[in-house]
From Swiss-Prot:
Keywords, ordered alphabetically: Chloroplast, Plastid, Ribonucleoprotein, Ribosomal protein, RNA-binding, rRNA-binding
Protein name: Small ribosomal subunit protein uS4c
Domain S4 RNA-binding, first and last residues per copy: 92-156
HAMAP family: Ribosomal_uS4_B (MF_01306_B)
Family: Belongs to the universal ribosomal protein uS4 family.
A GO molecular function held by the record: rRNA binding
């Protein structure tokens, strides 16, 4: 299954707000339903609940079905909680790191910067959005002038307290902002509201 490139509002109406996909907020149809309407709705199956959790994770991080399945398999082979390791793997992707630093408004925007070879990790150009960042990595945004003003405005409007503790943003060189990975992200710093166990259960027979 390929990466979704259609209307984003259609997705968040169905799956609720996904900060990585779009910064627009919308009240989901589930929340809009009145109490009487909710009582008449059919009982949602456990499969549908797990499927929705999986779809929320996939669309938020901009993954294909195959990519997400591969991440689940990697998480299963690692020591510790499979769900938390899965979230950690996704959060430490380069495209997501740029998003969490506040350099770009969404993960698709971060992917565009990376694909255009404007991002350096430890002084080396990285053009792979899925690149796995590690503690002590230094990420430099070396965008051309056409991007610099956009990035500067974005950073100025982004509250510093929104940057999670495992990351640090340095503006000592305004034209080349740098991000520092302090340590691996913990569960409390995950930006997406999700029950990762539902995703693990969904893939229990596939991974």
């Amino acid at each position: 299954m390929s990466r979704y490139r259609g209307p984003r509002l259609r997705i968040i109406r169905r799956l609720r707000n996904l900060p990585g996909l779009t910064n627009k907020l919308i009240e989901s149809k589930k929340n809009q339903a009145s109490g009487s309407d909710q009582s008449n709705q059919k009982k949602v199956s456990q499969y549908c609940i797990r499927l929705e959790a999986k779809q929320r994770l996939r669309f938020n991080y901009g993954l294909t079905e195959r990519q997400l399945l591969n991440y689940v398999r990697i998480a299963r082979c690692a020591k510790g909680s499979t769900g938390q390791i899965l979230l950690q793997l996704l959060e430490m992707r380069l495209d997501n790191i740029l998003f969490r630093l506040g350099v770009v408004p969404t993960i698709p925007s971060a992917r565009q910067l990376i694909n255009h070879r404007h991002i350096l990790v430890n002084n080396r150009i990285v053009d792979i959005p899925s690149f796995h960042c590690k503690p002590k990595d230094i990420i430099t945004i070396g965008a051309p002038k056409t991007y610099q003003s956009i990035i500067t405005k974005r950073i100025e409007s982004f509250a510093k307290d929104q940057i999670p503790d495992h990351l640090t943003l340095s503006l000592s060189e305004p034209k080349k902002p740098k991000g520092f990975v302090n340590y691996l992200i913990n569960r409390e710093s995950i930006g997406l509201k999700i029950n990762e166990l539902l995703v693990v259960e969904y893939y229990s027979r596939k991974a």
